[in-house]
Regions:
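Carbohydrate-associated surface elements
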Residues: 40, 169, 191
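Short hydrophobic beta-strand element within catalytic cores of glycosyltransferases
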Residues: 313-316, 320-323
């Protein structure tokens, strides 16, 4: 079997840990040929000039591991409107048995559907959009999602064999906004890169490396941080625990970027906080693994799946985008307030050995459930099932 991944709307950035990168890698490891077709000239704004130059220097055809990468020209007419050139030629050259189109919101989808229909092969599409990250302009959201994409999906629905949402809310979005038949919709969560996670040294070694003691209780959070992400409340909760229990040795590690000046000043002035800038993939996993708990008080981030990969317990708010991420491997909070965070951290801080052991078993189970090995296996089963 040969699967081609169309990553025009969802950018494919060499060496990153997004689903577009990891799913082809793990499917390849399962013995299935994988190819990726991505833009060769349109890259996210957050990439540096050097990163873009490094990708372009590889040319239009190269491999990462055993996954074949094909870069094609695209033209962006607006933030939401990206047009690929010679996509059909690229697909025909690969001659796939399956097309996996990443995201619904791109003009590449009807092209992929036309090839799939003409050659009688399965078309699978995933969705990362929901009501939280869609446009807040209601008129534009209706025109773009319900009319433009919805009418496109209606025209090609018979060709789509599976429509995946990466969370339950994004499964609901597929039905409500795109009109896809409920029978075709399924959850395919963002997974855990267990291969790289298993190469990270032990917690003891990492604490020595970063200057922490075995008796320290380390809380970690990262990514884009600030008031909107609840980082200010996380700092406040940690400081309260330190004040009320000076012997707790609680410490807060933050990495990434704090986006508002007030929270940045709060973090710099706090005696419990250590700040790191953006980290590469290895250092990110190291900081997550050395911690006793990882906390994101308000919104989902793919760093949560990274924490799952290294078996670090979680404190997160239960929402439609996170409700599948805790089952014995952490604590839900009802809101992102300092009081809610403090209660959850205190529970973990005061656990007896039996509860710690049970929590660790829960972490291992969630790691196995979200492993990209498990997710790749599901995709293969779904594809074979669609052919019966």
């Amino acid at each position: 079997m040969k699967i081609v991944h169309i990553c025009i709307s969802a950018p494919y950035i060499d060496g990153w840990g997004y689903q577009e990168n990891l799913l082809p890698k793990y499917l390849q490891q399962a013995g299935i040929q994988n190819a990726v077709i991505a833009s060769g000239n349109d890259f996210p704004f957050y990439l540096s000039t050097q990163e873009i130059s490094d990708i372009k220097a590889k040319g239009e055809n190269y491999t990462i591991g055993e996954v074949y990468i094909k870069r094609i020209k695209t033209k962006r007419f607006s933030t939401s409107f990206l047009v690929p050139f010679h996509l059909m030629d690229a697909i025909e050259a690969i001659q796939p048995d399956v097309i996996f189109h990443h995201n619904f919101n791109c003009t590449s989808l009807p092209i992929a559907a036309r090839y799939a229909k003409r050659n009688n092969i399965p078309l699978v599409v995933d969705n990362h959009a929901d009501v939280l990250n869609m446009s807040h302009n209601r008129i534009w959201a209706f025109v773009y999602y319900k009319l433009l994409i919805g009418l496109t999906c209606k025209a090609i629905q018979k060709t789509i064999v599976k429509a995946y949402g990466v969370s339950h809310s994004r499964c609901d979005f597929i039905k409500e906004y795109y009109g896809i038949d409920q029978k075709k919709i399924d959850l395919l969560p963002i997974g855990a890169d267990v291969d790289i996670a298993d190469t990270i040294p032990s917690k003891e070694i990492l604490r020595q490396k970063y200057g922490y003691q075995e008796t320290d209780f380390i809380v970690v959070s990262g990514g884009k941080m600030g008031v909107e992400k609840g980082t200010d409340q996380l700092i406040l909760a940690t400081e309260r625990i330190r004040k009320n229990n000076p012997n707790s040795r609680i410490k807060l590690v933050l990495f990434g970027k704090i986006e508002d000046e007030d929270t940045l000043l709060q973090a710099k002035q706090s005696q419990v906080v250590t700040l790191f800038d953006w980290c590469d993939r290895i250092k990110t996993l190291e900081l997550l693994k050395m911690a006793d708990v990882a906390c994101w008080p308000i919104h989902h981030t793919t760093l949560i799946e990274d924490a799952v990969a290294v078996c670090t317990p979680l404190i997160i708010r239960k929402t439609d985008t996170t409700e599948h991420l805790i089952e014995g491997n952490g604590i839900w909070i009802e809101n992102g307030s300092a009081e809610a965070i403090e209660r959850a951290m205190s529970l973990l801080l005061n656990q007896d050995e039996m509860r710690k052991s049970a929590m660790q078993q829960g972490c291992e189970k969630m790691k196995n459930r979200l492993s990209y090995n498990t997710i790749a296996e599901k995709v293969v089963k779904d594809i074979y099932g669609s052919r019966q």
